[in-house]
Each structure stands twice: as C-alpha cells, then as structure tokens.
Amino acid sequence: MNTFTHINQNGEANMVDVSAKQDTVREARAEAFVTMNPETLQMIISGNHHKGDVFATARIAGIQAAKRTWELIPLCHPLLLSKVEVQLEALPEKNQVRIESLCKLSGKTGVEMEALTAASAAALTIYDMCKAVQKDMVIEQVRLLSKSGGKSGDFVAKS
C-alpha cells in the first residue's frame, strides 16, 4: 500500500527530501474545462472581448502559474522547468473551453502539480476575464492526464 510521502512518522506535514534522488526526465499533462453560455464563448472566439485576447492571457497565466507552483502549494519544491505549454481549444458544441497543459523537466521530482496548477490558473483567468459578461461559468474536470518519469512510473488517466 502506498503511503503519504508528505507526512512524517509523527503525522506532521513535511517537505520530502529529494536530495539523494537521481535526475530523470519527467513530464506531466493536465486538463481543465470552462463551461459557459454560447454567447460568452462566441465573444472569446471572435476576439470581441473588451479586455483583449482571452486565450493569450489565459495561456500566459497558466505558464506563470506553473513556474510559481512552489509558492502556492506549501510542500512543493521549486523546480527548474524546461518546458511549459498551455493549449486552449474552443468546443462550441459543448459550450466549453478545454485547457491542456504540459510541464517537463530533468530533475528529482515530478511536475504533476505544476501541470495541474497551469491548467487551473488558465481556467481561472478565463473566468476572471469573462465574469462581467457571465458569472455562472463552471470550471470543472481538472485532472491529471498523464505523467512519466520517476520511480513511481508512468500514469495515463482513463478516458
């Protein structure tokens, strides 16, 4: 059975010591969805939003968030990310925006939290930029899609 790595023998939260681990190439992908009214989505797609390019702003927010995950999640290590990618796709048939993030590095610990943070921050940025038009948008299905590298092995989410 797996144990919680961030809890010490006294039941206290602690940062995992990764100093003895070997560097390996690690990669993680995550996704999130923002569901909204068709009119809100059309405003984003057409580029007519008064605050500017929603997708470009959300992409930059996701990249910045991945780089600063260690400042947001208390027990995360600061990481030297070698790649962060955030892709946004309008899904008009579902009135959604799909966000997929990719984080990669060669290091001692995984990048799952960075990928999840990137997707989440991009979704939050879409909400922030569009809340004046629609307050009942829904951010949902934030999840890890895959991870590779490290001693715990690879993971691929079920469809």
UniProtKB/Swiss-Prot annotation:
It catalyses: (8S)-3',8-cyclo-7,8-dihydroguanosine 5'-triphosphate = cyclic pyranopterin phosphate + diphosphate. It comes from the Bacteria. The active site is at residue 128. GO terms for biological process: Mo-molybdopterin cofactor biosynthetic process. Substrate binds at residues 75-77, 113-114. InterPro entries: MoaC, MoaC_bact/euk, MoaC_sf, MoCo_biosynth_MoaA/MoaC, Mopterin_CF_biosynth-C_dom. Its EC number is 4.6.1.17. Pathway: Cofactor biosynthesis; molybdopterin biosynthesis. One of its GO terms (molecular function) is cyclic pyranopterin monophosphate synthase activity. Keywords: Lyase, Molybdenum cofactor biosynthesis. Homohexamer; trimer of dimers. Catalyzes the conversion of (8S)-3',8-cyclo-7,8-dihydroguanosine 5'-triphosphate to cyclic pyranopterin monophosphate (cPMP). NCBIfam families: moaC, PRK09364.1. HAMAP family: MoaC_B (MF_01224_B). Belongs to the MoaC family. This is Cyclic pyranopterin monophosphate synthase. It comes from Glaesserella parasuis serovar 5 (strain SH0165) (Haemophilus parasuis). The gene is moaC.
